[in-house]
Design a protein with these regions (language model features):
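Short amphipathic alpha-helix with an adjacent loop that forms part of the alpha/beta core around
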Residues: 272-284
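Polybasic, lysine-rich low-complexity intrinsically disordered segments
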Residues: 10-11, 15, 21-23, 39
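Mid-domain Rossmann-like dinucleotide-binding core that forms the NAD(H)/NADP(H) cofactor-binding site
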Residues: 188-273
Length: 287
């Protein structure tokens, strides 16, 4: 699922999305954007501020479209093209009153406007980002940061919290800023829509690596959401010979069958689930 553009209304009471079969709302809006350049020959600060529109949580199951100034603060500046709807995002949306003022969105792709200090990037490059940084800013000088382990920074701070300065907003915005070291250039054979799914597919890859799936392994995946489907895709890539997905939601089960990522799809709440799994695996149980 991906957002693409903003609705005309001033607030959202629901989430409009694009998915592969083109359902959902499909209106894209082009909004004039005003850059203000304050450069003095320093290319890392070529763009310092921009007026843009962004979606902010304004209550339970409610977004509000606002306009504000985004400062580059020396970071890379990106134009967001696609952003995924993560389960974390929907949790924030349902509890929007608690998270009022937060700009979410961390599964995204975009186009570089200003690369900041990343010399490997240039304006116009298509990128995806290391998404943990949308929720927290690493300090860059603690022991964890110096080891490259930014997730465990001991001095991290949260962005756009409780209506504070826009700072580094999530990707439910026209533009966002990102730490230059957290951006990955998309290869030519990966579309921006596919690039927005880099984060959930990285989660699936990690799960399969940790599970040490090998060629000809038979794999059972508990849960068939985007992460479960990602695990199934990676299990196949790693050579699994048979993949079974167990899922509670009947709609998700049909989606999994439609994408043909698993050999067997079973209802997680089936009274005979244990026997089904034994039959699929060809195993037997003795007491």
């Amino acid at each position: 699922m991906v957002f693409q553009g903003f609705a005309e209304e001033k607030s959202w009471h629901g989430i409009c999305v694009f998915i592969k079969n083109k359902t959902g709302c499909g209106t894209q809006m082009t909004v004039p954007v005003c850059w203000r350049s304050r450069t003095h020959g320093d290319k890392s600060k070529e763009w310092e501020a921009i007026m843009m529109k962004y979606a902010v949580l304004s209550g339970n199951e409610r977004f509000e479209i606002r306009e504000g100034e985004l400062k580059s603060n020396g970071c890379a500046v990106l134009q967001v093209t696609h952003v995924g709807v993560c389960g974390t995002d929907t949790s924030y949306w349902h509890e929007g009153e608690r998270y009022r003022g937060v700009v979410i969105g961390h599964e995204y792709s975009g186009v570089v406007v200003a690369p900041g200090t990343n010399r490997a990037l240039k304006p116009g490059d298509r990128v995806a980002g290391y998404t943990q940084n949308v929720f927290q800013e690493p300090c860059g000088h603690c022991e964890a940061c110096l080891a490259g382990d930014w997730d465990h920074c001991t001095n991290r701070r949260v962005f756009t919290w409780k209506g504070g300065e826009l700072g580094h907003p999530g990707a439910y915005s026209q533009y966002t800023t990102w730490f230059p070291h957290s951006l990955v250039k998309l290869p030519d054979n990966v579309t921006n829509e596919e690039g927005a799914m880099a984060e959930p597919f990285a989660v699936g890859l990690h799960a399969i690596q940790v599970s040490q799936v090998k060629p000809n392994d038979r794999v059972l995946i508990l849960g068939g959401g985007i992460i479960g489907m990602s695990c199934a895709e990676w299990a196949r890539t790693f050579g699994a010979s048979e993949i079974t997905v167990s899922e509670l939601n009947p709609q998700k089960r049909e989606i999994i069958r439609g994408y043909q990522v698993a050999d067997h799809v079973v209802a997680a709440d089936a009274p005979d689930l244990e026997q089904q799994l034994l039959d699929i695996s060809g195993a037997a149980m003795t007491c």
